[in-house]
């Protein structure tokens, strides 16, 4: 049966080759997420291996976070930007989960996230979720949870206001746009635990910080860490 399955897959690849979501090249058999060339060229930040990194410095100045990490740099016009766009807007949610697994193994290897018990994806408002069909942050969280062997908590935090997209606002207006948009409905599930707040892309950080502040107000004795998939290279890169 496995020989037949392998044959069918081989014929399928011959006529319908799997393409790398970053460069568009053909994916070699056995490749995961991206092709081998792109895997070695990923613009990693290295933040998951160091507590004192640029993202932690920015966030910890505003909220008490234990750890803060970003997996890669968001570079406009790059194939990695297109990968994120695909799982965020084009329905390729499996990409988000696979990227989460990859990211999660880096977090696990660092040893800095070993005590994380619950992973909280930044929620979407139900109207936006209904329109999109899913929340990409949940699939990222699922992938990370596999590597960290932690529980994904999708229900304790909810988005109560459907604020306009942050991209529609100037930098200063984004902070007003996120005020009071989250609520915690099950604080007892968060209290006393080490939580990992997960989102896809951080720009100003206004949305993520609003969510973090809401959690810490509802469960002040929890420990909070943050993991986002990508941050802008121009703001967080060593040469940016």
Question: Which residues does each PLM region occupy?
Answer:
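Glycine-rich phosphate/pyrophosphate-handling loop used in enzymes and phosphotransfer proteins
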Residues: 1-198, 203-240
């Amino acid at each position: 049966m496995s020989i037949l399955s392998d044959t069918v897959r081989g014929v399928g690849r011959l006529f319908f080759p799997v393409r790398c979501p970053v460069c568009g090249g053909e994916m070699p058999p056995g490749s995961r997420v991206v092709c081998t060339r792109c895997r070695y060229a990923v613009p990693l930040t290295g933040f998951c291996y160091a507590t004192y990194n640029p993202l932690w410095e920015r966030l910890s100045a505003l909220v008490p976070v234990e750890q803060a990490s970003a997996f890669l740099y968001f570079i406009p016009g790059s194939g990695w930007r297109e990968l994120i766009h695909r799982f965020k807007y084009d329905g390729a949610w499996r990409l988000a989960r696979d990227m989460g697994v990859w990211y999660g193994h880096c977090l696990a290897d660092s040893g800095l996230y070993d005590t994380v018990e619950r992973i909280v994806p930044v929620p979407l408002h139900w109207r936006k979720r209904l329109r999109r069909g899913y929340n990409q942050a949940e699939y990222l969280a699922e992938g990370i949870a596999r590597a960290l062997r932690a529980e994904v908590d999708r229900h304790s935090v909810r988005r109560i206001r459907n604020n306009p997209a942050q991209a529609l606002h100037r930098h200063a207006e984004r902070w007003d746009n996120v005020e009071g948009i989250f609520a915690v409905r099950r604080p007892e599930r968060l209290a006393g635990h080490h939580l990992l707040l997960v989102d896809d892309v951080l720009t100003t950080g206004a949305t993520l910080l609003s969510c973090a502040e809401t959690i810490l107000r509802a469960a002040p004795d929890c420990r909070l860490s943050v993991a986002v998939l990508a941050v802008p290279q121009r703001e967080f890169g060593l040469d940016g």
